[in-house]
Structures are given as structure tokens and as C-alpha cells.
A protein has these predicted regions:
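Catalytic binding pocket for nucleotide-activated donors in carbohydrate/polymer assembly enzymes
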Residues: 10-16, 20-131
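Short helix-loop-beta junction
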Residues: 1-8
Length: 131
């Protein structure tokens, strides 16, 4: 297998960042990829919350738009048709300040909107509709 210099090939259990230390590892990365064909998972907001420029698979099939991320503002949307183009754009201009701005805005959005406090508030509001 050909290894690329800008990709970390270390498995999670082969370094000190395991279990609850994993977010500290994510914070060391400039970018990350989250892809799930059928439904978004915790990696979507976990990576964004760590401040990574997050390439997210958001499609009609996985219904990921409900998370509230905005393509080009809080993350980069990818799908099976555009991911190579999106990665190439980033890798060919990796020092462009727009990537850091998107990562920072994505982190702020995630910490503000996808947290336990907000989830409990939303759940209480939903429950009061049915009581």
C-alpha cells in the first residue's frame, strides 16, 4: 500500500490517545473525513468539535442535513460524486485561511448546537407538546 505523507496511518490503540483522550488526538489534526452512507454518526460532530476542517458526507440518502451544518461555512459537504474534487481543492491550497475559518465556525456551531444541554432542552420541549 502506498502511504501518503499527509495521512496518519497510526491505529488508535497504538498511541497514548485512547478512550477519553481521543478528543485530544483529534485536536492535533487540521482536517478529517466523516462518511456514513445511511445515517450520520457521532464522528460528524466529534471531529468538528475538535476544530478539524471536517469533510462530511451529507446526502439525501443519509439525511444528514438535519444536523444543521452548512457547506462551505461550518464544514465541507462531500458525496460519492464530488469527494475527489473537494479533497484536491483542499490539498492544492492547504494554507488558505478559508479552511481555518470553516473549521473554527464548524467548531463553534457544534459546541453551541450539538451538546447535551441543548439536547435536554429540546427533549423537554418535545415532551411538553405531548403532555
Amino acid at each position: 500500500m502506498r502511504q501518503l505523507p499527509y495521512v496518519d496511518y497510526t491505529t488508535t490503540l497504538q498511541h497514548k490517545y485512547v478512550n477519553d483522550q481521543y478528543p485530544k488526538l483529534l485536536e492535533k489534526y487540521a482536517s478529517s473525513i466523516t462518511a456514513s452512507s445511511f445515517s450520520p454518526n457521532i464522528k460528524y460532530w466529534e471531529n468538528a468539535a475538535a476544530g478539524c476542517l471536517t469533510f462530511m458526507e451529507i446526502t439525501k440518502k443519509n439525511r444528514g442535513e438535519y444536523l444543521g451544518y452548512i457547506d462551505g461555512e461550518t464544514c465541507i459537504f462531500i458525496n460519492e460524486d464530488n469527494y475527489q474534487e473537494k479533497f484536491k481543492e483542499y490539498l492544492n491550497d492547504i494554507d488558505n485561511p478559508k479552511w481555518g475559518k470553516i473549521a473554527s465556525t464548524g467548531r463553534e456551531f457544534t459546541l453551541k448546537n450539538l451538546n447535551n444541554k441543548k439536547a435536554v432542552k429540546d427533549l423537554i420541549e418535545l415532551m411538553t407538546l405531548y403532555i
